[in-house]
Amino acid sequence: MSKIEKMSIQGVRSFGIEDKNKQVIQFFTPLTVLVGPNGAGKTTIIECLKYITTGDFPPGSKGKTFVHDPKVAHETDVRAQIRLQLKDVNGELVAVQRSMICTQKGKSTEFKTLEGVITRIKHGEKVSLSTKCAEMDKEMISALGVSAAVLNNVIFCHQEDSNWPLSEGRQLKVKFDEIFSATRYIKALETLKKVRTQQAHNVREYQVEIKYLKQNKEKAREIQDNLQSKEKQLAVSKENVKSIESQLEPLKDRLADIQRNLSKVMRLDNEIKALESRKRTMEQDNQDLEEKMEKVFQGTDEELNGMYQNHQRSVREKERKLNDQQREMDRACKESQRLNREKGELLVQQGRLQLEADHHQQYIKTRDSLIKSLAAQLELDGFERTPFNQRQTSNFQMLVKERQEKDEAHANQILREFSEREAMKQRQLDEMRDKKTGLERTIELKSSTQSKKHTDLKNVKYELQQLEGSSDRLQELDEELQKTERELENVEKSCNLEALRGEVLQLQNQKSELDRNVRKLDQEMEQMNTHTMTRTQMDMLKKDKADKDEQIRKIKSRHNDELSLLLGYFPNKKQLEDWLYSKRKDINQTRDKLARLTKELVAAEQNKNHLSNELRRKEEQSASFEEKVFDVCGSQDFDSDLSRLQDDIEKTSKQRAMLAGATAVYTQFITTLTEENQPCCPVCQRIFPSEAELQDVINDMQSKLRLVPDKLKSAEGELKRKEKRKDDMMELKPMRQMLADLKEKEIPEIRNKLVTINREIQRLKNDVDEQETLIATFASEEESAKACLQDISLMERYQMELRDVERKIAQYATKLQGVDLNRTVQQVSQEKQEKQHNLDNVSGKIELLRKRIQDQQEQVQQLKSAVNELTAEKLHISSNLQRRQQLEDQNVELTTELQCLAREIKEAREQLFPLESTLQKLQQEKQELLQRKESSYREAQEKVNDIKEKVKKINLLTKDIEKYSQDGKEEFKEQKESELQELIGRLNECEKLKEKVNREMVTIRQDIDTQKIQERCLQDNLTLRKRIEELKRVEEERHQLLKEMGQMKVVQMKNEYQELENKSESLKTNHSLALGRQKGFEDEILRFKKELRESQYKEAEEKYREKMIVMRTTELAIKDLDIYYKTLDQAIMKYHSIKMEEINKIVRDLWRSTYRSQDIEYIEIQSDADESVTAADKRRTYNYRVVMIKGDTALDMRGRCSAGQKVLASLIIRLALAETFCLNCGILALDEPTTNLDRENIESLAHALVEIIKSRSRQRNFQLIVITHDEDFVELLGRSEYVEHFYRIKKNIDQCSEIIRCSVNSLASYVH
């Protein structure tokens, strides 16, 4: 058995929060007695035991009021801790600790539980485990060996709940159910019942599902059989198709061979025609070339090639020289470019150097100006005139440096003087602050002590004030107590509880009648649910019928227009399949015709491509000839241009001859006029009248003579150019003839042929398009019909299923014949709701009356509690009057100490005031000193910084001036100017070289142009000989192709092709028929497979078997649940009967041995069957009540017994329950058991408790804990041999509870 050994309490209710206030109590065996006045903290010990074992707070407390109040403790956080040491049911030592914290936040407090700790001794070592509250509660229940309900309601029952056995019926039932642990089993029974109901509902659903699954299984089997039949037919059809294909394959191969040979014949014919056309073209081209050539070379090919190669070598040599001159020109150009770049770079450098020279002069002027200004500022002599030389500049820098050092020394001296004065002033300030701080600290400490003493004095005065009126208060309490007792007596007389109970009984009868009506309606609902299932199945079938009708309508609506347009009517499946077969035959015939037209179109397009290529070649040749003629002539009027050119050549030749003779004529005329004494005009023989006129004529002739060479040269150049152009035009004359033939004859002929063949191709294309359109139309119609075929098949299946559904609907309609369908489920449900509403109203009225009864009972109880509270306050005031003298002495002592502290604080404050004024004065003096120091130092420093800044600028300018001279920038500038002049001279020489090379290149180009004219003539001779050779090869190739074509037996091949094609067409027709049948079988197989893949047929047999297994196993499970439900219910009832008999026996014995009056023989607990339980619950539940037996009559004790009888009955019932249910835990705590008992019953209770202890003392772990304020009751218990010590609970001077261990022998002296 489990046993508690000791417990420590800290920070709970009135128990202090300091470690010194921790209270420890050790529990004795078999009896522990706790004595103390009201409010001392006795009940707190029971509350701590209950909390440490169950985790439940006292009634009306959520934890905040359970912990010591932070406002009373003058703390923000208050921690509470309870520790319990016990032995569990196995005798092992266990230590348990629970902690709490309460935090003051503004006006509200916040409560929180901390992690608990359980410590066990294992193998001689302590093992601690931190757990959460819920886990610790389970551990404690396991360790003590009793349930939480027994701990709360029996072992550690709170004083406020101690009378629960006589509480209201519903609350009493909950308590007893928890103690009996019946709640869990009742819940288990309810769960079993719900599971059984749900499973029964599932079985009904399974039956409906199985019915449909069976239909689906049979339908799936039928579809599977049809599928196998179609697959066999498909295999036979595939064999037939393969046989036809094996016959077609060699025919196709032979037809392909013949087709290739015929294509080859067509290709050979086209090639022969192309070669003949090419031969004619080549012959004409050769003839045109011979006519164009001025001279046809008569030598051998080797001689012609030798001359051509020699001529090419001469041209290449001249071109090489031209390239050399070009390279020389390129080198000269590159050199000129390089020199120009260097010239540009030198010009840029010259500009940059000139800019630096200008800056240098500006720096010198700026520096001298700054030196002159600063020298005047510093009053330095010798620096009035600029410019300054190097010596003057150095002398100036030295003088300025000395002046700077002098000014800086003066500024530092000022800074040091002020710093010394500042340090002295700071020391005075520190001394004053130390004195002031010491006095303030003294005042603060004494003020704090004064505040504490004031608080203590206030508390003492408050207690004295409370005690002032204690005597008067005792008299008032006596009067209030008498008044309250009279009021209690009047209330008990005025209560009309019996009338209210009678009204409740009448309403309960009405409730029972309504309950029977509701059960009757439930039975009617259950009966209607059976027919509802049949109705539901019939509704489902009707819905299925409507769905199938809608599907058939949709299919017809979707395809009616299309099929009517194709066939002229809406067909069935067989009619549609026949139409598809005929349509496939039309498509095959059209495709064969299309193939023939395509072959003819390909041949025509090949011929067109050949003619197009030939036309393109001729047009390109014509364009090339026109371009060459235009390049030479400048227009397309070749003959007119040639005639004009010949006239121009004759005119230019005459002009050249005239100019060539003019030189000799003018020379002779000038010689004659110069040498003769009397010259005359050489033309008219006129003598010149004067020398001046003669000289004018001579000058005019000399002037013309000087112009003759240039004009002669120009005329010769013009003549050569025109002759060259004439040669070029003569070379183009054969080309001109060829161009005319191309434009007038060959190109028009080819274009006419192209027009003819284009018309033929267009005709063939139209035919092909027509056949393709026809095929597309046939194919579209076929696809449309095929798309409809699946829906037509589906529609036929829907029609079959529709007939099956209509048959089932007729069967269900037969089943429902004779059933009254006027009263619907909704009507019955509505009537049930009305009855249920009335039932709820009656139940509400009953609860309202019970509440009134309870209110009256509570009013009586409140008055009784008021009587108890007044009695307790009276006892408390009596005990407090004994502390009055001690509080008066403490008042005098605190008053004296406070007067002394006030005097000392006043003296310290008087010393503090002059110190504060002196401290402020010193701080002001220090601040003024700092301001003067900062001002003086700033003025001196600004003067020094100004000089430094100006010297810095002068030094920077001097540095730049010196750097310019040191870098030699002036000499470098002169050097670059010299280099620029030299570069300009080299650039002029390079330009002269370029002019020379250019003249030589012009001469070489003229020679090359002359050589190329001769080269063209040789090239034409070579071209002519190559064309003749090519013409021979073309003729040989044409004869070869004619020979090859004659060996191919074209007529025999065409006859064989026609015969094989007819045979192939026959086989193809049979093949198409076989394929059509095969396609029909495949469509059927696909449709059957698709149906089998549908959700209702997929694995239909497996689903049926599985659902059947589930239903059978569920039915077996329902039977097992019924058996288990009945067995568990019977076991609960039997256990309940045994325990109630055992409890009532103990209650009777304890009552007879304890109660001293003769009005009640004994009491017992009666458990009556609950009349409100409906038949649908199928089990009994109990309502509990405590009755008292008077003679042969059993009366409810609740409302009929006195307060003392109520307390005694509740105590005895708790003792009986502890005896019955605490087999593993011998602990029982009684809080104020003598409340409301008279002296005789107190004595008998003490005797009964001693007897119980005596009977249980043989159990080592039996522990009875008694808490009381009645010391006479303790003395009665102490007369037994089981009590040697007891605990006295009281409050110390800090109003914190203390637990003091006392001997029983000291009790008598304390009482008396």
Swiss-Prot record:
Coiled coil (UniProt feature): 203-342, 415-558, 587-628, 712-1070
GO molecular function, one term: double-stranded telomeric DNA binding
Cofactor-binding details, from the entry: Binds 1 zinc ion per homodimer.
Reactions performed catalytically: ATP + H2O = ADP + phosphate + H(+)
Positions with a binding annotation for ATP: R13, N38, G39, G41, K42, T43, T44, V67, D69, Q159
Zinc-hook domain location: 635-734
Residues that bind Zn(2+): C681, C684
A Pfam family assignment: Rad50_zn_hook
InterPro entries: P-loop_NTPase, Rad50/SbcC_AAA, Rad50_eukaryotes, Zn_hook_RAD50
Subcellular location: Nucleus; Chromosome, Telomere; Chromosome
A GO cellular component annotation in the UniProt record: condensed nuclear chromosome
Binding positions for Mg(2+) per the UniProt entry: T43, Q159
Alphabetical UniProt keywords: ATP-binding, Chromosome, Coiled coil, DNA damage, DNA repair, Hydrolase, Magnesium, Meiosis, Metal-binding, Nucleotide-binding, Nucleus, Telomere, Zinc
This enzyme's EC code(s): 3.6.-.-
CC cofactor: Zn(2+)
Family classification: Belongs to the SMC family. RAD50 subfamily.
Entry note about domains: The zinc-hook, which separates the large intramolecular coiled coil regions, contains 2 Cys residues that coordinate one molecule of zinc with the help of the 2 Cys residues of the zinc-hook of another RAD50 molecule, thereby forming a V-shaped homodimer. The two heads of the homodimer, which constitute the ATP-binding domain, interact with the MRE11 homodimer.
Protein name, UniProt field: DNA repair protein RAD50.L
